[in-house]
Amino acid sequence: MNDMGEVQREKVAVIIGPTAVGKTKLSIDLAKALNGEIISGDSMQIYRTMDIGTAKVTKEEMDGIPHYMVDIKNPEESFSVAEFQERVRKHIREITERGKLPIIVGGTGLYIQSVLFDYQFTDDAGDAIYREQMEKLALERGVEYVHKKLQEVDPESAERIHANNVRRVIRALEIFHTSGEKMSDQLEKQENELLYDVSLIGLTMDREMLYDRINLRVDIMMDQGLLEEVEGLYNRGIRDCQSIQAIGYKEIYDYFEDRVSLEEAVSQLKTNSRRYAKRQLTWFRNKMDVTWFDVTDGEKTSEILRYIEGKLQLKSNNSK
């Protein structure tokens, strides 16, 4: 507590931005300077054996900095925003208690937002019979059909939730069915109450340069063995799981199921990655109060470090 008897909020630095913009290197540089530990804010890096397609941080890249929320689930296991929220808040508490700065880095907007704001996830008002009906419809008539039903009652949630994320599409429909309230409206009510003392940094760059980096990253992933990584999952019989809906996996799965050629799969992977980057930027700009740093002309580590020091009233190792 401070002198006024108020509970001091935990300090958290957050680095967000589109895929391939350079978040990983920045986060490690900042962690070294600010005595920090890193929490992944990526919903797919949680999966073991899914390393290349998720651009998972390597041991070498970590350079001794502790990382959390990486490799905590098997690919066939499901994972919810609510579980992410609970685990990450626990890590924030524990890192703070050790006298370190929690640094969340990633591009999965809703997951990060659920941690920072007063989001409350409740399954109490569920309707199992309705849920089963929707699951049956998704199987019989396709995921797009169920997603279209969501568009009719809650277009905001439909815009945010991809059609392939059937579980979340059905959950949003279920909330509307049981409460008459849109999931998007429920979330909006919870979007204004920050739980932490947050410095929220966003990285951006010239769109064409970003798209070139994304295309190059896909080529590098293929050279590193993405095809073999996905083949391993496919040969293990992993199908219809949350994990393989990720960009980088669903496209290569189409190749293994003879829907497309390998060349077409790689081309689609690049297209989907570019579209995802665009959606990420739009989402962050619309949903969160981000201080943006343009890294088109090179990294801005020193500038960002000074900003975080000022915002969170910290002193870095570099300024001692």
Swiss-Prot record:
Keyword Protein biosynthesis listed: no
Ligand binding (ATP): 17-24
Cofactor: Mg(2+)
GO terms assigned for molecular function: ATP binding; tRNA dimethylallyltransferase activity
Substrates-to-products reaction catalysed: adenosine(37) in tRNA + dimethylallyl diphosphate = N(6)-dimethylallyladenosine(37) in tRNA + diphosphate
Region Interaction with substrate tRNA, residue ranges: 42-45
Domain of life where this protein originates: Bacteria
Enzyme class: transferase
GO biological process: tRNA modification
EC number annotated for this UniProt entry: 2.5.1.75
Record-marked site positions (Interaction with substrate tRNA): 108, 131
Binding of substrate, residues: 19-24
Function description: Catalyzes the transfer of a dimethylallyl group onto the adenine at position 37 in tRNAs that read codons beginning with uridine, leading to the formation of N6-(dimethylallyl)adenosine (i(6)A).
Quaternary data: Monomer.
NCBIfam families (UniProt xref): miaA
PANTHER family according to UniProt: TRNA DIMETHYLALLYLTRANSFERASE
Family: Belongs to the IPP transferase family.
Protein name: tRNA dimethylallyltransferase
Originating gene: miaA
